[in-house]
């Protein structure tokens, strides 16, 4: 019986150690930008690696700066929804298909939730331009990031005036 308890204790300690190591590795991967954060992130909080990757994928104009970013993909390069100081941008690059769509802030006539998500499902924000075109953004609801993202779009586009 004592031998069984020793073995069970060792196995339990190994399991706890593995879980701790996985959580630590995930945290490091998120902080370094190798794995996308599960939350909406302010531009000044993004790792420089992610900022450069997003600028490339979203085809930034010279001097353009990120205000908010969210990725629904495993990596920031695979998918991005971005608010900059000039545009609202959505891009996808899944390896076989890549596209990038955007609206200039001065062209935005409306921005609203099409669907309010929760911890497990992203919210959908529809941004409409004055010419009738629109852009759908998928934004994480965790820690009210979707509300902060939408409020920032409205403020940047002058819709709250």
Which positions does each model-derived feature cover?
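Anionic N-terminal interaction surfaces
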Residues: 23-81
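N-terminal Sec-pathway targeting helices
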Residues: 1-18
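Phosphoinositide-binding peripheral membrane targeting modules
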Residues: 69-123
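Terminal and domain-flanking low-complexity segments
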Residues: 142-161
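Short polybasic amphipathic segments
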Residues: 123-129
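Canonical phosphoinositide-binding patch of PH/PH-like domains
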Residues: 129-147
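Non-catalytic accessory segments flanking enzymatic or RNA/DNA-binding domains
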Residues: 111, 133, 155-158
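Glycine-rich, low-complexity intrinsically disordered segments
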Residues: 13-16, 20-24, 41-44, 155-158
